């Protein structure tokens, strides 16, 4: 995997997610409560859009680290394909553990935010 392709994909994620949302709206919904865990999306996206696998993974990285995606991993047993249909792949315990850890990190950052803003206001 090309690290530079992955980094470029991650940095361009915001605009590329909009492209993915236009092409596969059920896989990349705008509303957080509609998000579902994806089934091996990177290779299919790379093939469909002519991207490298590393670039596609980079684009998807911020998406799967979002709070809404982590919550979806914990709430849904089945993963979905890009067209929104249910995949045969299930959400495994490792994915649930990673989502739980990520949500804890997000919560800790949110808890620190008022303190950080107060400190910035004093400067």
Task: Mark where each language-model region is.
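Extended alpha-helical interaction segments
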Residues: 1-41
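Residue-level signal for the start and early helices of compact helical domains
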Residues: 11, 15, 36, 64, ...
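Residues that form generic nucleotide/phosphate-binding pockets
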Residues: 19, 23, 44, 48, ...
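Generic preference for hydrophobic/aromatic residues in regular secondary structure cores
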Residues: 29, 45, 79-80
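Compact, well-ordered interaction domains used in eukaryotic information-processing assemblies
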Residues: 45-57, 61-66
